[in-house]
Every structure is written in structure tokens, then in C-alpha cells.
Amino acid sequence: MSSASIIRNSSLAPSGADKITWVWNNMPLLRAVREDFEKERPLAGLKVALSVHLEAKTACLCKTLAAGGAEVYATGSNPLSTQDDIAAELDRLGVHVYATHGCTQEEYDLYIRSVIEPEPDIIVDDGGDIVHMIRTQFPGLEKKIIGGCEETTTGIARLRKMEKNGELHFPMIAVNDADCKHLFDNRYGTGQSVFDGINRTTNLIVAGKKVVVAGYGWCGKGVSMRAKGLGARVIVTEVDPVKALEAHMDGFTVMSMEKAAEQGDLFITVTGNCRVITEEHFLRMKDGAVLCNAGHFDVEVDTACLNRIAVEQKQ
């Protein structure tokens, strides 16, 4: 157990262990990597800091890095995706964990800071928060860092902006650009998991509904494909004319969000951009329309405006 960890409850570890074991048995490639790592110890003496969605699959990544000799410091990249039982089990295994489900922004910043303060050699980022904090609060560490990788489209956009402004001072690999990431994880993984979440949350049938998908990148393609497979009538909104044409040729109805707002029953944003659905769209929507965001950050739907104009709020 890591004495430095900040977790919700260590007694949750057995539940986390069961989840990790199940996932591990379905990850043959990572198991093979771990076997090599245990023999070769390529990360011996190095510190690795991770900011990822802290759940069973990323826990297996943490275990693999540790098997390679790394001292691993892990936190969540989104407070709502952190699983407390996974954090507890990783802590039991000796990973330094700083993560609690539903933490405040202040706690989230503390957790990011906690994986940076040990001065990591390698970074595994999902959304760019580690790199951003190093740049703004720990600039002296930049020369020490060997490099790292960024998983998601949103984080890569932040990194490219930093690079353009001359603010990125160590190499970062854009994992999302790899074919094995966007062709499969984004399209099939995100496509399925979005509807897993929607179905568990709403308990609504998708068939026959008009589903509006904002964005036709790889995630948007996957979401649209799964919506169609579930029997929905799919409308795609896309600002890139080439991607919009691709959606049309794939058999989907394409229109602006202004028009789609009047028709949709279920709205799913997967753009990585800010304020995709705003007040002008809320006012056009049907009563009972369901809004969902599948982007990394909670910025695609203008929830501040929605809270302001809402007649009633329930949780």
C-alpha cells in the first residue's frame, strides 16, 4: 500500500480487484507486453505520472508499467469516471493514487499536482491536464521530462496549440493519431459505450427516435453507426464540409444544429469543441429532449445557460 495515496476507501479494494482481473483476462496484448516488461524492466528507475480515466482497463496499464520497473503515480482525468474501488486496489498494489469519484475542482487540481510533484520522467495524459499544469505551475520540470503520450483528441488539440505558441518543451506522442486508436477505440469503443451509458441512465428505447449526433469524427462515426443499429433515425451536424458529405454518403441526414434542434429526441455531442449546443438551440427543442455529452470535457453543452433558463431542476 502506498502511504502517500489519496483515495476514498481502502476497503473497496476487493471489488476493484475483481474488475481488474476480469478485464485483464480479456487483454492478451497487454498481458504479452507485461511478460516482456517483467523480464527486461525497461522502465527501472523511472517515474511515470498518469492522468487517465481511472477504471479497470487503465488499472491494467498501471500494473504493466509497474511490472516494467516504473514507480507509478496515477490520478483521474475526469472526476466522474474515477472508480473508487479501482483506486483502492491500485493503492493496495503499491501504485501512488490520488483520485476520488466526484471530487471538486480544487481536489482535482490537487490530485494533478500530486502526480507532478514527485518530478516524473514520463507522462501519460488524457486531456492534457498534466502537461498544462507543468507548463503553468512547474516550468522548471520541463527539461527533466523525457516525454510522454496524449490519448484523446481534446488533449492533442491543446498540445498542438501549445506547440504552435512555442510552449511545449518536451516530446509528446499523439496516441489518438494511431490507426489502432481512432479506427477501433474511437469508432467501436466509444460508439458502444456511449449507448451503454445512455441506456443505463435513461432506460429509454432508442429505436424510432431521432438521434442528433454533433460531430462526425471517428467518435461521431461510431456513435452514429450504433444509433442506426439500434433503430434510430440519425441526424448528423458537422461544420467540416468534407465530413458532412461523408456522413451524407454513409446514409445519414445532415443539417445544421439550428434545424436539428427542432427535430431531435436525443442529442449527443462528440466534437471536442465548446458551446456546440447553446441557448438558441435549447429554446427550439422539444419538451423532454435528452442531452448527452461524449466529449472529454463538460463544455460542449452550455449547461450554465441551461441552468439559468430552466424552469425546474431535479436530480
Name each model-derived stretch:
Residues 52-70, 185, 189-263, 269-274:
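Glycine-rich phosphate/diphosphate-binding loop of Rossmann-like nucleotide-binding domains
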Residues 51, 126, 268-271, 294:
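Short, well-ordered coil/turn residues at beta-beta hairpins
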Residues 2-43, 74-209:
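Glycine/serine-rich phosphate-binding loop and adjoining beta1-alpha1 elements at the start
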Residues 50-58, 78-82, 128-130, 218-219:
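Gly/Ser/Thr-rich loops at beta-strand to alpha-helix junctions
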Residues 116-117, 206, 260-264, 282-286:
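A short, aliphatic-rich alpha-helical micro-motif
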Residues 69-70, 95, 141-144, 231-232, ...:
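A short helix->loop->beta-strand "cap" motif at the edges of active sites that frequently abuts
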